[in-house]
Amino acid sequence: MAQKIQSVKGMNDLLPVEQKDFKLTAAFWQAFEDTVGRWTRTYGYQQIRTPIVEQTGLFVRSIGEETDVVGKEMYTFSDSNDSLSLSLRPEGTASCLRAVVEHNFLYNSPQKLWYMGPMFRRERPQKGRYRQFHQVGIEALGFEGPDIDAEIIAMSADLWEKLGIREYLTLEINSLGNREERAAHRAALVEYLTRYEDKLDEDSKRRLKTNPLRVLDTKNPDLQEICNAAPRLVDYLGEASQNHYARFKAMLDGLGIQYIENPRLVRGLDYYNQTVFEWTTDKLGAQATVCGGGRYDGLIEELGGKPAPSIGFAMGIERLLLLVSEYGSLEVNAAPDVYAMHQGEGADLQVMKYAQALRAQGFNVMQHSGYQSLKAQMKKADNSGARFALIVAQDELANGTVTLKDMNGAHDQQTVAAADLTNTLQQWKNA
């Protein structure tokens, strides 16, 4: 027997049933996708789909060459034909904006876009953190005021309500100011942290030289006291940034959305400015962040487009659904409405015709394949979870009848005229 080939570590199959080490099912995932589709439409967002492979330079320019994502986590390879450096996308915003700039999508009006799909990072796999993971992203492009900042947070809170997990999530916010304000804060922060360089861990020493703001994001408990006493970016904000942040918070207050101000919230990507935020939970262990985002007013220009202030966020689907599966609610309709079975010569073809007719009327029908006994077929019907069983036997072919069985026992088994099949099932379903 040939040796089995296993999936790549940290990249999961999505099956119709739960797995030992990955509890999410394809049906649960599909129900979430359907919910997201309806949710985005209610806010006027249009879907965009981009390739999973991009030129590496896109992420170097947008995310930042010195970030952990670009420096350590991307899957990068060379195209064999022209040695062009390519990478599997580690996040969705850069790809979305590349497409917007390339196709001149902002030429006459702002845009509200959303995407959903797989991302890739070379990380140590653990619960809620995978090498292939999936995100839903929201991007509001060409909007400058704090009103859009508040709207997309209200939008995310609305989704948490729909999924039944609002009470398990906490909103943290901060302002990163503009480029000049961050530069002034960076100088003060470097001066402060340099005094404690001998106490920093190796990762923080590296960040001190490449992206000192990320030192404040450390999870090392030995560095918390140092970081808590560090210069705060909020103290370097100018009047315009302060006003934007104050109006943003006032809108959240007016919407009744509770939040915590976290001056150490910086996000992991270099393109953020002004408003940043995260939705966190204490129900998933170390992987506390379920959703995060912020403003990236200079990124479209950085990628070759005309200046367009913008804001967006992304949520990790795996983490989110782990939370929903344990604490929330999501209606999953994986079972068919009808399990169609047959017995005797000629009944197999006729049951196909009935099944097709029912599907045309909106019923989900699973048709039995093979020629087992009626008892065995009925067992499969029961295992399928179908609400109704349709039985076509040879002796019913001549007189044009079928047998219907309500698997929940709400109706007695009946033999009905084939012409009344759809109406009878519809009445039973609506009863």
From Swiss-Prot:
Catalytic activity, as annotated: tRNA(His) + L-histidine + ATP = L-histidyl-tRNA(His) + AMP + diphosphate + H(+)
InterPro entries: aa-tRNA-synth_II, aa-tRNA-synth_II/BPL/LPL, Anticodon-bd, Anticodon-bd_dom_sf, His-tRNA-ligase, HisRS-like_core, HisRS/HisZ, HisRS_anticodon
Keywords from the named record: Aminoacyl-tRNA synthetase, ATP-binding, Cytoplasm, Ligase, Nucleotide-binding, Protein biosynthesis
EC number from the UniProt entry: 6.1.1.21
Localization per record: Cytoplasm
Cellular component GO terms held in the UniProt record: cytoplasm
Broad EC category: ligase
Keyword Aminoacyl-tRNA synthetase recorded: yes
SUPFAM superfamilies noted in UniProt: Class II aaRS ABD-related, Class II aaRS and biotin synthetases
GO biological process, one term: histidyl-tRNA aminoacylation
GO MF, any single term: histidine-tRNA ligase activity
Keyword S-adenosyl-L-methionine in annotation: no
Subunit note: Homodimer.
NCBIfam families assigned: hisS
Protein family: Belongs to the class-II aminoacyl-tRNA synthetase family.
PANTHER family found in the cross-reference section: HISTIDINE--TRNA LIGASE, MITOCHONDRIAL-RELATED (PTHR43707:SF1), HISTIDYL-TRNA SYNTHETASE (PTHR43707)
Name of this protein: Histidine--tRNA ligase
Organism (species): Neisseria meningitidis serogroup A / serotype 4A (strain DSM 15465 / Z2491)
